[in-house]
Amino acid sequence: MPTIQQLIRSARKKITKKTKSPALKSCPQRRGICLRVYTVTPKKPNSALRKVARVRLTTGFEVTAYIPGVGHNLQEHAVVLVRGGRVKDLPGVRYHIVRGSLDTAGVKNRVQSRSKYGVKMGSKTAAKTAGKK
């Protein structure tokens, strides 16, 4: 524990919290334009072709964002909404594209966790919830 004299000489330093998604500039989401849509392979124990997009945000940053869910309709010049959130097995991917907003369509035939994939209540889901009652 420092003495009062030591504290007078140099005050305690505040620990600054480093943001995990600096390109969003303290906003929950940002709009961006797809520059390139492609697939990448994950880190060592995993094996797949993960769909990602290079996006230029309205903040001026150019980031790599993950496209969640099965299948997508994204092409070059598509306008997308980007949120924070990394993908653990893809180095350098610190953002997710929000499904079901702007030019991004929701996941087809999705019944569970629909809100995360931009899917409205469909006849398939309505029948399932009616059957539970």
Curated annotation (Swiss-Prot):
CDD domains: Ribosomal_S12. It holds the Pfam family Ribosom_S12_S23. Transmembrane segments: none annotated. Keywords: Antibiotic resistance, Chloroplast, Plastid, Ribonucleoprotein, Ribosomal protein, RNA-binding, rRNA-binding. It comes from the Eukaryota. Changing residue 91 to L: Streptomycin dependence. InterPro entries: NA-bd_OB-fold (IPR012340), Ribosomal_uS12 (IPR006032), Ribosomal_uS12_bac (IPR005679). GO terms for molecular function: rRNA binding; structural constituent of ribosome. The keyword Amino-acid biosynthesis does not apply. GO terms for biological process: response to antibiotic; translation. GO terms for cellular component: chloroplast; ribosome; small ribosomal subunit. It is found in: Plastid, Chloroplast. PANTHER family: 30S RIBOSOMAL PROTEIN S12 FAMILY MEMBER. Belongs to the universal ribosomal protein uS12 family. Part of the 30S ribosomal subunit. With S4 and S5 plays an important role in translational accuracy. Located at the interface of the 30S and 50S subunits. HAMAP family: Ribosomal_uS12_B. This is Small ribosomal subunit protein uS12c. It comes from Chlamydomonas reinhardtii (Chlamydomonas smithii). The gene is rps12.
